């Protein structure tokens, strides 16, 4: 008895939506297989030697243990992970494994949990990975489309399906940025003027999605006065790239805590922007909005 799922990468923050906004991407993605075993243990196999297989240190193992204990499942699981989402890339690598595992266990043992509860369980993996039980990556990984995490106790997630074409380019630098470290450099306090700016622009981005206004969405996304100016310094050539493509994209910003860069190119410039990004970072991919974890 086993279930195999495809768990997509995600892009959190999207400029002004720090720790709130998340967007599901169609690819890259992890492939996760969860198999029920009679021995009451959790076995993890992963094709990336840099990822621990100890279930107490692996995000998938932590999520699995929490769900098995909470529902007194009485069996163990073997979790096989084929990583497609690079760790430390700012594309929700730990979230993909966490969300995929939660989804697969729910399917395998017919727990009938709703998506919000799956987000809650998946966020236990994020707690182990980044030191915070944040859900801005696992929420879009589960729901698909665009999500907003608006509360934690209790957990509340608002979901906006994206029903229009939105071209996306992801440039993935060959460096890693640790999420914990990327949080430590952030300002401890925010000025009132910057707060008003970010709240206003975040509201505008939601309005833009409902009105399918790519231009407004991208323009407001690039208006962050708090997080991007600090984290952008960690990414080689980030501000140079942003300046070079500014007239050819609806928007461009840091994906999550970086170093990946997410761009929404204008239709007539998609090839040109892709080539510019690839000139700086060979690992540049073209993708689109994803639908969330699914059984394969």
UniProtKB/Swiss-Prot annotation:
KW Ligase (keyword) present: no
Q: Which Gene3D superfamilies match?
A: 3.30.230.10, GHMP kinase, C-terminal domain
Name the EC number(s): 2.7.1.39
Residues annotated as binding ATP: 86-96
Superkingdom field: Archaea
**Example of a GO MF term:** homoserine kinase activity
Known catalytic reactions: L-homoserine + ATP = O-phospho-L-homoserine + ADP + H(+)
Q: Which Pfam families match?
A: GHMP_kinases_C, GHMP_kinases_N
The question of whether Cytoplasm is a record keyword is answered with: yes
The pathway is:
Amino-acid biosynthesis; L-threonine biosynthesis; L-threonine from L-aspartate: step 4/5
Q: Which GO terms describe its biological process?
A: threonine biosynthetic process
Q: Where does the UniProt annotation locate this protein?
A: Cytoplasm
Q: What is one cellular component GO term in this UniProt entry?
A: cytoplasm
Which principal EC class is assigned to this enzyme? transferase
User: Which key words are in the record?
Assistant: Amino-acid biosynthesis, ATP-binding, Cytoplasm, Kinase, Nucleotide-binding, Threonine biosynthesis, Transferase
UniProt-listed PANTHER family = HOMOSERINE KINASE, HOMOSERINE/4-DIPHOSPHOCYTIDYL-2-C-METHYL-D-ERYTHRITOL KINASE
* Family named by the database record: Belongs to the GHMP kinase family. Homoserine kinase subfamily.
Q: Outline what the protein does.
A: Catalyzes the ATP-dependent phosphorylation of L-homoserine to L-homoserine phosphate.
Q: What is this protein called?
A: Homoserine kinase
Q: Which species is the source of this protein?
A: Methanocaldococcus jannaschii (strain ATCC 43067 / DSM 2661 / JAL-1 / JCM 10045 / NBRC 100440)
Instruction: Name the lineage.
Output: Archaea, Methanobacteriati, Methanobacteriota, Methanomada group, Methanococci
